Amino acid sequence: MLAAPHLKARFDILTSIPGLGEITALVLLIDMPELGSMDAKHAASLAGLAPITRQSGQWRGKSFIQGGRATLRQAIYMPALVAIRFNPPLKAKYDALRAAGKPAKLAITAIMRRIITTANALLRDNRKWTETMA
């Protein structure tokens, strides 16, 4: 499928994450080629999964998700839903957020961010996912 050996290695690392399929791994490789060469906050911001807080002086608005690469954010949504069901550490994180009273969409966005930051760390360290990673 992938002719270049370094791309095949990156593809194998991404598909080792439970919930991330082949198509999502390809989208990550295409839309975010710098993944693995930055810190976690920058990766989340580039994917559009870092909250932006609206505030000015004493006035405080709400935080929201905006900016970044929309196609990447759209591509990671369904794998986040799959990971909530089949990836035990991410399911535990989702359940903890919901038990704390957070809305479902916020918890899903947190899982999306966790997937991106985990993928970034795995590609940076050049190793596959293990259950203790998340």
Where are these regions (language model features)?
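A detector of single, family-specific signature residues
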Residues: M1-A134
